[in-house]
UniProtKB/Swiss-Prot annotation:
HAMAP family: DNA_mis_repair. Residues 335-354 are annotated as: Disordered. The lineage of its organism: Bacteria, Pseudomonadati, Pseudomonadota, Gammaproteobacteria, Cardiobacteriales. It comes from Dichelobacter nodosus (strain VCS1703A). One of its GO terms (cellular component) is mismatch repair complex. It comes from the Bacteria. Pfam families: DNA_mis_repair, HATPase_c_3, MutL_C. Residues 335-351 have a biased composition (Polar residues). This is DNA mismatch repair protein MutL. SMART domains: DNA_mis_repair, MutL_C.
Length: 590
């Protein structure tokens, strides 16, 4: 058996680097956090080959004293904490004192720093084993990391393409810029400016990273509970993304990724967005540092909350309440060109007209008396016309107004006090039915049923049979009942609201979907998804013609429905075109 030996310091640092330094973005994270902890508000980052050849960061922070420079590259040397109590209430981004030592062990690192009280700067290059030397540098620090992983080639093989590594760096800088203000960070690669994030205020930083569209398609939230404060912006349920790269969550200004928080946010958006879409948000949670453990992971990206359930419930309830009170925004219209509208091009000679044309030639020339009579009639002034009395226009105070008609049997057009409302009648009806189903289940625990005059037979697949055996009792709470004769499933009752729907297709889909939710803890989610699909089956369809009274009833129901701004899949249910937008469409007032 091999003897147990102490590892050399260089190898210890390289092992530590394996936990902390995964890629160039990991290096950037550590040195940027050190700069922020030093009070820097302006950072300039330069890279080459997406950071594998060069990472250089200059800041305007407080700098490092000469006598501390060498110690800064020593393992577990830090100015951030002194005791266990400090660790349990740490508020700085860095605190372990191992980042610089780890970085220097796998790269060629040079650090130059100057404090306000120093006459000049001092420079140190650990890989050269040279003494600290004087240098020219304004107050602040510049750290230069060259040839990352030069002495650990196996690690270098795991790096991705320059494009991917650069993407990770830009994502990191976006998150850091969002976390504080005033703050500005720029990124250059080979003398080319890649980005500049930040601003004098948090909203300026938000705009620089997320853009104007996010500000227009999000709501700002503020909530407090038992010492926790939540602030930020969440995207509308109709404004989502295919990936999760537009999600930023900060705990005490530290960008983190937490499963507990992710679950709370996802649950808050449940039944408002499509399952394959992801919400966009920038959220800041502030709480006592003693209530969150930031020392749970080497990269400090994951945290542990000491009151996990309380934190989860606070996040969920705050977001859920805000999201369900959202009203759709005014429609975003593409500006019209000032040029005259283009008329349809004339048809070719072979084109067939839609209507029979009146001949332009006469069978005979008009007689003289006919021509004279026409001339006299044309010269006679028209009789005076008394205008018909106009009905008094009543002010429309209903939020969604009064229905005017349908477009293509798909959209309801209504007029309200602000202007024009356009409603997607299927999406709107779907949301109405969904909330009604949920309300009945919540209050009565049993959906009203309709017994079928003619029971409907259905041949079940093995998967559907298993679902029926496992969840049969629960299915009956949704309003379904059945009997089985000679292995044939015969449907006897359905939810009363589905009596006019394709019940065979619905029950088949329900049983199939239940196979995807085998755990009892997931039944709530399964129930909501199944109800959503049932409502989708029952809701009015495109090209269903409704009377004006039916349209108005749908509008009134929608006005009293929670989360009425979008259907269960995240599509808008209605949009508002105000008078200003309508004027702009016709170039009025220009």
């Amino acid at each position: 058996m091999a003897k147990i030996l102490l590892l050399p310091p260089a190898l210890i640092n390289q092992i530590a680097a394996g936990e902390v330094i995964e890629r160039p973005a990991s290096v950037v994270k550590e040195i940027v956090e050190n700069a922020i902890d030093a009070g820097a508000t302006r950072l300039a980052l330069e890279i080459e080959a997406a950071g594998s050849k060069l990472i250089r960061l200059s800041d305007n922070g407080s700098g490092i004293e000469k006598e501390d420079l060498a110690l800064a590259f020593t393992t577990h040397a830090t100015s951030k904490i002194r005791t266990l109590e400090d660790l349990e209430q740490v508020s700085s981004l860095g605190f372990r004192g191992e980042a610089l030592a780890s970085i220097a062990s796998i790269s060629k690192t040079t650090l130059t720093s100057c404090t306000q009280s120093s006459d000049h700067a001092w420079k140190i290059s650990p890989h050269l084993n040279e003494n600290i030397t004087p240098a020219a540098h304004p107050q602040g620090t510049t750290i230069e990391i060259r040839d990352l992983f030069y002495n650990t080639p196996a690690r270098k093989k795991f790096l991705r393409s320059d494009r991917t590594e650069r993407y990770h760096i830009t994502q990191l800088l976006a998150g850091i810029a969002l976390s504080r203000a005033p703050f500005v960070i720029t990124l250059h690669e080979q003398d080319r400016k890649i980005l500049e994030y930040g601003g004098k205020t948090l909203k300026e930083s938000l705009k620089s990273v997320m853009g104007d569209e996010f500000l227009a398609q999000s709501i700002e939230i503020q909530a407090e509970h038992e010492g926790m404060h939540l602030h930020g912006w969440v995207g509308l349920p109709t404004y989502t993304h295919q990936q999760t790269d537009k999600q930023y969550f900060f705990v005490n200004q530290r960008l983190v990724s937490d499963k507990l928080v992710a679950h709370a946010i996802k649950q808050a958006y449940e039944d408002m967005i499509h399952r394959q879409r992801h919400p966009i948000f920038v959220l800041f949670l502030t709480l006592d540092p003693a209530l969150v453990d930031v020392n749970a992971h080497p990269s400090k990206r994951e945290v542990r909350f000491r009151q996990a359930q309380l934190t989860h419930d606070f996040m969920f309830s705050s977001l859920h309440r805000a999201l369900r009170n959202i009203q759709p925004r005014a429609a975003q219209l593409t500006p019209l060109s000032s040029a005259s509208p283009k008329l349809p091009e004339s048809t070719t000679a072979t084109a067939q007209p839609h209507h029979k044309m009146i001949p332009h030639t006469f069978a005979r020339p008009p007689r003289l008396q006919e021509t004279k009579a026409y001339y006299q009639w044309a010269q006679t002034p028209p009789p005076a016309v008394t205008p018909a009395p106009q009905p008094e226009i009543k002010k429309i105070n209903l939020p969604l107004g009064q229905a005017l008609g349908q477009i293509h049997g798909t959209f309801i057009v209504a007029e309200n006090a602000q202007g024009l409302v356009v409603v997607d009648m299927h999406a709107a009806h779907e949301r109405i039915l969904y909330e009604q189903f949920k309300s009945v289940l919540k209050t009565q625990k049993q959906i009203p049923v309709q017994r079928l005059l003619l029971p409907l037979p259905l041949t079940l697949t093995p998967v559907q049979q298993d679902s029926l055996a496992q969840h049969g009792a629960w299915l009956k709470t949704l309003g379904f009942d059945w009997t089985i004769n000679d292995k044939e499933f015969i449907l006897l009752t359905v939810p009363a609201r589905l009596k006019n729907s394709d019940c065979i297709s619905i029950i088949g889909d329900v049983l199939q979907e239940l196979s995807e939710f085998p755990k009892s803890t997931q039944l709530q989610r399964a129930q909501e998804q199944i109800i959503a699909n049932m409502c989708c089956h029952q809701a009015v369809r495109a090209h269903d013609l409704l009377s004006i009274s039916e349209m108005n009833q749908l509008l009134r129901d929608l006005e009293t429905t929670p989360a009425a701004g979008q259907c269960n899949h995240g599509r808008p249910t209605w949009i508002q075109l105000d008078a200003t937008q309508l004027d702009a469409l016709f170039l009025r007032g220009q």
